[in-house]
Design a protein with these regions (language model features):
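Conserved short alpha-helical segments that host acidic/polar catalytic motifs at enzyme active sites
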Residues: 1-246, 250, 265-266, 277-289, ...
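Generic C-terminus detector
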Residues: 558-600
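Acidic/histidine-rich
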Residues: 152-187, 459-485, 520-522, 527
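Active-site phosphate/pyrophosphate-binding segments
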Residues: 260-264, 268-294, 386-512, 583-600
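Glycine-rich oxoanion-binding loops at beta->alpha junctions
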Residues: 65-82, 273-285, 308-309, 313-344, ...
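Glycine-rich phosphate-binding loops that contact phosphosugars or nucleotide phosphates
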Residues: 288-433, 469, 516-562, 575
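Short, glycine-/Ser/Thr-/acidic-enriched flexible segments
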Residues: 9-13, 39-41, 49-50, 73-75, ...
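Short helix-capping/linker segments at secondary-structure and domain boundaries
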Residues: 12-13, 133-139, 166, 186, ...
């Protein structure tokens, strides 16, 4: 969940290191650091907090033609400069950055450094000290690095500098994302993802698990575990460096909420040809022929999967289960005879999903996997059989907004076409209905002042609740997640009918309770739940469709009830943003969170 960068070339790499880390700050922002070689000696600068804190400490005029950098999300050891990366060997010769978790680092400490006090509390320091151990046994740097890596169990993306070799980065990878960026004019780059390097290159090399890479300014050498040189074609991405800019917006989160209109239009443009759905027929056939679908995701993606299940079961008649990736790999349910697996991951790097993929491939190599992701060059898009891109554009704020609505929209298109192929096509035109949804989102975004005022008046307490029934219950879960992660208000999403079974005991005077009602048949039932909590002092609000609205409700334009979660959730996203903004919180980077969860 950390981010790493590296540079080697005939130029000063300091600006790239800072730019790259800034682009990776969504992965972790407890601390940061850069290091390189100056006059044959290590130059290391580290700080606690954001990249701007690090930048302020960098010596004026620092020139690095070989450098590495790291932004940290703490997994081993407290948040301080001692534990922040880069880490150095005892003799100061070797410097290392690492993303991942070394599962056997305590065992390695006992075996190699018993009685020796290491500098930090991290698992990473053990690696760089191991490199020195093997270097002291007369191995050259490449072999010492390989030997050290061979002792590791767990996940890692590593980038090593030898201060006695100012022309080389040593790189290794296992179960943690890492790319090589091919520069021009004798410059090459390393980064946790393409976003870190997109301002400098859009030409990348994939690194597979177990491979080692020697990166020089004018050459890249990839070796497999046996030391054989591997030839590999480079690739480019659909990333646009301009998307990284906040533009007129104060935060990425509000920018990305507003970008949902454009994202919906992109989805419609990419997945429809005329009025026909434009999705690879192999994907359609694999989903259509499955006897059960397994949608798997984490956090917001899991919530999107809950909505998607409704489409596959209601429209296509295919039994569908939704599972948390973090549980699935270690508690695999009884699988059907002909399953199809659908992964949801904004980044395409989610470690828990990769663990599920590995587990299921070991069960049956013939299983088929589809991933819905926002990043075309991601690990999961390369490792799964099929990919459907979300076409939502770069999402940088830790709290996902436009990727969530894009996931639901894409799932709805897929389910609709599968239903059509099974002669169960719903009695509406989904392209037309998604266009109506897009207009509804635009209308909601035109009313942000009202929504901002509602948020200020509603979310004044320490606890809050969202409730809903049917498909609105899933929206309530996502709305609650969004509010808690950015505003730090303890928020839960509940099925309206479950309030009486325990949760209503938590209702106090002025406790905010927001109900989502986008189904006519569930309108009265949910309003009854709202009355129950209001009579106990709750501060209540109903978000509903115009056709169902009563005095005091917040009404959104009428849309297809099955697809309504794509529109209604936008109101709750704005609630979350303004609740956090009003409290003066860092909306884009909530405490303790990282956007791309690359460790299990």
């Amino acid at each position: 969940m950390c981010g790493i960068v590296g540079f080697v070339g005939e130029a000063n790499g300091v600006k790239f290191l800072i730019d790259g880390l800034s682009s990776l700050e969504y992965r972790g922002y407890d601390s940061a650091g850069i290091a390189g070689v100056v006059n044959g000696e290590a130059s290391v600068t580290k700080s606690v907090g954001r990249i701007k804190n690090l930048e302020a400490l960098i010596p004026e005029g620092l020139h690095l033609e070989l450098g590495i950098g790291h932004t940290r999300w703490a997994t081993h050891g407290g948040v301080n400069t001692t534990n922040s990366h880069p880490h150095q060997s005892f003799n100061k010769r070797f410097i290392l950055v690492h993303n991942g978790v070394i599962e056997n680092f305590q065992e390695l400490k006992e075996r190699f450094f018993k009685g020796v006090e290491l500098v930090s509390e991290t698992d990473t320091e053990v690696i760089v000290q191991l490199v020195q151990v093997y270097s002291d046994r007369s191995l050259d740097t490449k072999e010492a690095f390989k030997k050290a890596v061979s002792k590791l169990q767990g996940s890692y993306a590593l980038c090593l500098i030898d201060t006695e070799d100012k022309d080389t980065l040593y790189v290794a990878k296992n179960k943690s994302p890492l790319l090589i960026g091919l520069g021009e004019e004798n410059k090459n780059y390393v980064g946790s993802d393409a976003l870190a390097m997109i301002k400098y290159t859009n030409n990348f090399l994939e690194i597979n698990d177990g491979e080692f890479v020697i990166v020089k300014k004018d050459s890249i050498t990839i070796e497999d575990k046996e030391g054989n040189v591997v030839e590999r074609e480079s690739f480019s991405t659909n990333l646009n460096a301009g998307e990284i800019d906040k533009g007129i917006h104060e935060h990425y989160m509000i920018k990305e909420i507003h970008e949902q209109v454009g994202a919906m239009r992109n989805i419609i443009s990419h997945y429809f040809d005329g009025h026909d759905v434009n999705i690879n027929s192999e994907i359609i056939n694999n989903v259509k022929d499955a006897d059960r679908l397994y949608i798997i995701g984490c956090g917001t993606s899991y919530n999107a999967g809950l909505v998607g299940r409704n489409y596959f079961e209601k429209w296509a008649g295919i039994p569908t289960e939704v599972h948390l990736a973090s549980e699935f790999a270690y508690n695999v349910p009884l699988l059907s005879k002909k399953p199809m697996f659908i992964f949801l991951s904004q980044s395409g790097e989610t470690a828990d999903l990769r663990a599920v993929l590995t587990k299921l491939r070991s069960v049956n190599a013939d299983y088929k996997f589809l991933v819905l992701t926002n990043v075309d060059a991601s690990t999961l898009s390369r490792e799964c059989d099929y990919t459907l891109l979300l076409h939502a554009g770069v999402e940088i704020a830790v709290a996902s907004t436009k990727a969530y609505t894009a996931q639901i929209a894409t799932l709805s298109i897929l389910a609709y076409e599968v239903a059509k192929q099974l002669s169960r096509q719903p009695k509406f035109d989904i392209e037309q209905e998604l266009s109506v949804i897009t207009s509804a989102i635009e209308s909601i975004l035109d009313d942000t002042k009202t929504i901002k005022d509602l948020a200020k008046n509603l979310f004044t307490e320490r606890n809050a609740f969202y409730i809903g029934r049917g498909i609105d219950y899933y929206s309530a879960c996502e709305a609650a997640l969004k509010l808690k992660e950015v505003s730090y208000i303890q928020t839960e999403g509940f099925a309206g009918g479950e309030l009486k079974h325990g949760t209503i005991a938590l209702i106090e005077e002025r406790t905010p309770v927001v109900a989502l009602i986008t189904s006519a048949k569930l309108d009265l039932n949910t309003r009854s739940n709202v009355s129950e909590v209001a009579s106990r002092g709750a501060n209540t609000l109903i978000i509903t469709l115009e056709k169902l609205a009563r005095k005091g409700d917040y009404a959104i334009p009428n849309v297809n009830e099955d697809l309504a979660p794509i529109a209604s959730i936008v109101v709750t996203q704005l609630f979350a943003y303004y609740a956090a903004y009003t409290k003066g919180l860092d909306v884009d980077k909530p405490r303790n969170l990282a956007k791309s969860v690359t460790v299990e």
